[in-house]
């Protein structure tokens, strides 16, 4: 079982309380000391869009000596170039079967996003790319994606990166939803992970979803420090 810790990025990017660069570096160091060997440490997005991630270059420089895998989110070519300039080697991208999500977060439709990522990641080793599939189990606006469309999308994701992460972005998936999507992965060659959000109205159910993932052979799960 592997844990991929996303707290310094996903946990902090929308937090009401902004941590200083020094506090982020300390957090990442403590996570490393606790035994976590895969940590997402920042997001190279435009600082006006996500102010809490504006210091990602500085954070990465300070933690780059840690003996663990350090991942960073890079939604576009500019972000990738910034990440490379400070020595980042592991790059995380995101997209969704939900076109509403794609337009709101990446400013393009799914077809264009795939094209942009293929161009942007040319020359980056596939094993260094992690692909987040947001709203993989359904979008609160658009509902569920039909299985044929989702299967084709997941196949394209598996071509982009060596690790594809299925995200229950709003924490509403149940065990049947999990099984329906995980069934699609059996014929697609990739390393699959799960990113399950906590929903306080059904907090006990998340462990049922973890068990389903484990039963389907998932051995890497995202976590986020509270």
Protein language model annotation of sequence segments:
Residues 1-44, 50-67, 159:
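Conserved N-terminal beta1-alpha1 strand-loop-helix module at the mouth
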Residues 4-25, 68-77, 102-107, 135-148, ...:
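Active-site mouth loops of central-metabolism enzymes
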Residues 4-6, 89-98, 130-134, 217-226:
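Non-cysteine beta-strand/loop elements that form the S-adenosyl-L-methionine
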Residues 11, 31, 83, 91, ...:
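Conserved, mostly hydrophobic/aromatic
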Residues 37-63, 95-109, 135-142, 165-175, ...:
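Glycine-rich, proline-tolerant flexible connector loops at the mouths of alpha/beta enzymes
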Residues 49-72, 111-130, 156-157, 178-194:
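Alpha-helix-loop-beta-strand connector modules within alpha/beta enzyme cores
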Residues 97-167:
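Conserved anion-binding
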Residues 167-226:
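Catalytic alpha/beta core domains of metabolic enzymes, predominantly
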């Amino acid at each position: 079982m592997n844990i991929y810790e996303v707290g310094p990025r996903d946990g902090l990017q929308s937090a009401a309380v902004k941590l200083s660069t020094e506090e982020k570096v300390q957090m990442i160091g403590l996570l490393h000391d606790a035994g976590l060997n895969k940590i997402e440490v920042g997001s190279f997005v435009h600082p006006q869009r996500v102010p809490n991630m504006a210091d990602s270059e500085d954070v990465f420089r300070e933690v780059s000596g840690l003996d663990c895998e350090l991942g960073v989110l890079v939604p576009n070519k500019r972000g990738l170039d910034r990440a490379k300039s400070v020595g980042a080697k592991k790059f995380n991208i995101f997209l969704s079967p939900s076109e509403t999500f794609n337009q709101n977060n990446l400013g393009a439709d799914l077809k264009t996003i795939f094209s942009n990522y293929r161009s942007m990641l040319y020359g980056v080793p596939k094993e260094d790319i992690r692909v987040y599939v947001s709203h993989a189990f359904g979008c609160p606006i658009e509902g569920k994606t039909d299985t044929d469309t989702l299967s084709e999308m997941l196949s394209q994701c598996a071509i982009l990166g060596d690790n594809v992460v299925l995200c229950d972005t709003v924490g509403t998936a149940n065990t049947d939803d999990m099984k329906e999507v995980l069934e699609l992965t059996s014929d697609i060659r990739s390393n699959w992970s799960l990113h399950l959000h906590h929903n306080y109205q059904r907090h006990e159910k998340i462990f049922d979803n973890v068990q389903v993932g484990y039963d389907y052979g998932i051995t890497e799960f995202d976590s986020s420090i509270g």
